Design a protein with these regions (language model features):
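Active-site-proximal loop and beta-strand segments within enzyme catalytic domains
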Residues: 20, 59-175, 182, 189-195, ...
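Bacterial Sec-dependent N-terminal signal peptides
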Residues: 1-22
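A short, well-structured edge-of-sheet supersecondary motif
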Residues: 34-67, 99, 150
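Conserved hydrophobic/aromatic pocket- or pore-lining residues that grip, position, or stack substrates
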Residues: 29, 49, 126, 201
Length: 201
């Protein structure tokens, strides 16, 4: 993400009306890759809704040396958390749910490590990293790629994860509760998280 922002800032230093050549883009991208020690990147420049340049630079992996092209897909990792939170905010703006609604109102099967937390857990709590679970708690249910745990499996297994702090008292980065948030989006909108994000964001 920080590389995308830096590249966007570099490209924005040119006047809006100025024509930037492909060679100038190449130099900017190559300098950015060197500065951040990035092996590969795909770049697209879009103007007035049309792609004017789409190009890959470098390699996907320093081990395989397979080249990046304009169609190379990169994992976006935790950038999806922003999409999830934005999707929840859209549904809240549409009065379909509220930040302070209880998760069990939408997902009755949702259970945390104790009854109080389960019943008090709100939509807001799903995205604030203050559940009481430790950093990366339960992540082995989703990593490495290829894990066969489904969303419902993850929701069902949350109750077995032990807290490291009291509910809402400490920040610990979390991944699994965003999967729960995605299921709330599914339940409220009638669309899978993927379809909702694709259509609305």
């Amino acid at each position: 993400m920080k590389y995308s922002i830096l590249l966007a800032l570099l490209l924005s230093t040119f006047s809006i009306n100025a024509q930037i050549t492909e060679k100038e883009v190449d130099v900017l991208v190559e300098n950015t890759m060197k500065a951040f020690n990035v092996p590969g990147i795909a770049v697209a420049i879009v103007k007035d809704g049309k792609v004017v340049l789409a190009k890959g630079y470098g390699v996907k992996s320093i081990l395989t040396k397979e080249k990046v092209d304009a169609n190379t897909l990169f994992g976006i990792s935790s950038n999806s958390k922003a999409f999830t939170t934005a999707a929840l905010a859209m549904l809240i703006d549409e009065k379909k749910l509220n930040w302070d609604d209880k998760v069990i109102q939408y997902l009755p099967e949702f259970k945390m490590y104790n009854e109080y937390v389960t019943h008090e857990f709100t939509i807001r709590d799903l995205v604030t990293h203050r559940s009481g679970l430790g950093l990366g708690a339960g992540d082995l249910m989703i990593w490495p790629d290829g894990s066969d745990f489904k969303e419902n499996d993850i929701i069902r297994n949350l109750q077995h994860l032990k807290p490291v702090s009291a509910f809402r008292t400490k920040y610990d980065y979390d991944n699994l509760l965003y999967i729960v948030a995605g299921e709330v989006i599914h339940k409220v909108s009638g669309k899978s998280w993927c379809n909702f994000i694709e259509e609305r964001i």
